[in-house]
Amino acid sequence: MIAVRDATGRELVLQSPPRRVVSLVPSLTETVFALGRGDVLVGVTCYCSEPKGAVERLERVGGTKNPDLDRIRALRPEVVLLSAEENRREDFAALQAAGAVFVSFPKRVCEVIQLIRALGILLDAREAAARIAAQLDETLAEIGARPFATRPRVFCPIWRNPWMGFSSDTYAGDMLAVAGAMNVLGERAERYFEVELEEIAAAAPELVLLPDEPYVFKAKDVPALAALSDTPAWRNNQVHFIDGKALSWFGSRSASGLSYLAQIVRESRR
């Protein structure tokens, strides 16, 4: 028998490891493969792009916000992997009625360690989960052992038209904090919100990070940031395009993503 708790506090009890799993969370799809259990996946979202060369064979069941529930039911999953943030409450309710669901919702990088261990229990991949969790734990320790003299003020939008940002009460926000940066929008009460560039300019960011997801920032978007042209980030050529997965994909990518962001932050202070 397998018993594991998810982010809602619910205990998921199964008689044996699931052999048919649907993942509606791209980062967890990648994590399942990293755990060596990609063979149990029977359906994923159209945004599940990793690992390349393996995920392409899987049935697509729509997007994270608009999954095809009938198609999912037809796949007869024993467990559906969800995110409290990426997926809709109504889809959770519908899928829960059809079978078992496992919900993830890490808002802190350190919480990913427990998530990975829980997935290891659920999928009967405890040893692989222990290795991945240990890697993240070691990365957190290594970064923590190198204190930051100062933390650069950073602006990291996630959308344009309208411009949107995120607070410190998010996984991405905590990734920036642990990596050594200070999110200029970190103290906002909302977790995700629209923002005016004039507000950002007033905060005088020293570093601007432009991820390639969810909005795909490219060179053509830089002129739209002209309101920031008098900020330290602009004057010191500290506007960088970054890998959005490193910032927001929690799971097996967390350790490498954190190291990647910490390096960018440190290099910005040289």
Annotate each predicted stretch with a short phrase.
Residues M1-V4, R10-L14, R20, V79, ...:
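Extracytoplasmic substrate-binding proteins
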Residues R71-A74, A94, M175, E199:
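Well-formed, non-transmembrane alpha-helical positions, independent of function
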Residues I2-R5, R19-D91, V184, A203, ...:
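A short, structured surface patch at a secondary-structure boundary
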Residues R37, E56-R57, A97-G99, A179, ...:
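Short, structured coil segments at secondary-structure junctions
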Residues S49-E50, V222-F241:
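Short glycine/proline-rich, acidic loop/turn segments that cap or connect secondary-structure elements
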Residues R88-A94, L207-L225:
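A ligand-binding cleft/hinge motif common to bilobed small-molecule-binding domains
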Residues P51-L58, R71, V112-I116, A219-K220, ...:
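Short, charged, surface-exposed secondary-structure boundary motifs
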Residues T45, D169-F193, F241:
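His/Asp/Glu-enriched short active-site or ligand-binding loop at hydrolase and phosphoryl-transfer sites
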